[in-house]
Amino acid sequence: IVTGDWSSDVCSSDLILEPIQGEGGDNHFRCEFMQELRTIADENDIMLIYDEVQTGIGVTGKMWAHQHFAAHACSDCCCGEDSSARPDIISFGKKTQVCGIAVGKRVEEVEKHVFEESSRLNSTWGGSLVDMVRLTIYLELIEKENLVERANETGSYLLNSIYALQEEYPNLVSNARGRGLYCAFDL
């Protein structure tokens, strides 16, 4: 990506990826990679979009997986304190039982963007009052039951258990990795 041609004659408007690739083999990106994407997006007037359909809503031990890549969360990596991997747009769904898009202020730089007016074109049945009430209740429960922190604590236990299996069976279990409850290993 860093050596790619990002000149103005290349028609790129967005960088879209999952902060942790689920269907792509459970690939956990390094902090530096995610922050470099933010730099590339900023330097080339490109929107950085995270697909948090599988990784969002607390499963990784943070409300959004991309929050693991913020400068304050990456103090153990080589990124500077002022670096960040913040997205311009987040897509989410599954755990909320509604599909959604969270949009940052950078979208306002785009003339006549689709978020200026309310629309239901992004989902056949989405956006109903029932959906909004259900989502509100889910978010209240997540906060009340402290589910994000509990996912972080339980995930730490799970990952440590996988590390123990990896140590006990090195020819069978390898590449233990995870954030919160979003853990994996190779067989």
Language-model regions: role of each:
Residues I1-C11:
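Single conserved hydrophobic/aromatic residue that forms the stacking wall/gate
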Residues E18-C31, D45-G80:
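Conserved PLP phosphate-binding loop immediately N-terminal to the Schiff-base lysine helix
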Residues M34-D42:
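Surface-exposed amphipathic alpha-helices with a cationic face
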Residues E43-N44, Y169:
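Helix C-cap/helix->beta junction micro-motif
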Residues A70-V114, G127-M132:
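Active-site PLP attachment segment
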Residues W125-N146, R150, T154:
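Structural motif of enzymes handling amino- and sulfur-group chemistry
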Residues E145-L187:
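Conserved PLP-dependent catalytic core of the aminotransferase class-I/II
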